[in-house]
From Swiss-Prot:
Positions bound to Ca(2+): Y43, G45, G47, D64
Gene Ontology terms, MF aspect: calcium ion binding; calcium-dependent phospholipase A2 activity; phospholipid binding; toxin activity
Note accompanying the cofactor annotation: Binds 1 Ca(2+) ion.
Record-given protein name: Basic phospholipase A2 Sct-N6
Swiss-Prot/TrEMBL cofactor(s): Ca(2+)
Keywords: Calcium, Disulfide bond, Hydrolase, Lipid degradation, Lipid metabolism, Metal-binding, Myotoxin, Neurotoxin, Presynaptic neurotoxin, Secreted, Signal, Toxin
Family to which the UniProt record says this protein belongs: Belongs to the phospholipase A2 family. Group II subfamily. D49 sub-subfamily.
Subcellular location: Secreted
Any single biological process term in GO: lipid catabolic process
Function field: Snake venom phospholipase A2 (PLA2) that displays edema-inducing activities, as well as presynaptic neurotoxicity and low myotoxicity. PLA2 catalyzes the calcium-dependent hydrolysis of the 2-acyl groups in 3-sn-phosphoglycerides.
Signal sequence segment: 1-16
Tissue and organ distribution: Expressed by the venom gland.
Originating organism: Sistrurus tergeminus (Western massasauga)
Length: 138
């Protein structure tokens, strides 16, 4: 069920930030966000609970925390400006909210890239009912 909602949200929001986040992930990991990160572990995808399963899942936990810190922003739909220079993502634009969203997405994409060696296929489409450990706080 969680996977269905993730795909539905991603399809509805393709004009917005989620498509941009997918592109950043592709740049940093050479993987498509769907299916690689759309329902990975306890935090990648819609919602999150429990303890992150590994370093990749922790990237998603930190990304969720980053979004939570944004006030008066719409991180799942706002579009932002960014460029790529020598393999480095540069967030741009004059809107502070959109720039912060971009920085959250950039940090997660970089984190995914840095943790490719520990990525575990067994955590793809991980059922959230198995995320029973006490949740961490941001």
């Amino acid at each position: 069920m969680r996977t269905f909602w993730i795909v539905a949200v991603l399809l509805v929001g393709v004009e917005g930030n989620l498509l941009q986040f997918n592109k950043m992930i592709k740049i940093m990991t050479k993987k498509n966000a769907i299916p690689s990160y759309s329902s990975y572990g306890c935090y990648c995808g819609w919602g999150g609970r429990g303890r992150p399963k590994d370093a990749t899942d922790r990237c998603c936990f930190v990304h969720d925390c980053c979004y939570e810190k944004l006030t008066d922003c719409s991180p799942k739909t706002d579009t932002y400006s960014y460029s790529l220079k020598s393999g480095v993502i540069i967030c741009g634009g004059n809107d502070p909210c959109k720039k912060q969203i971009c920085e959250c997405d950039k940090a997660a994409a970089v984190c995914f890239g840095e943790n490719l060696s520990t990525y575990k296929k067994r955590y793809m489409f991980y059922p959230d009912f198995l995320c029973t450990d006490p949740s961490e706080t941001c």
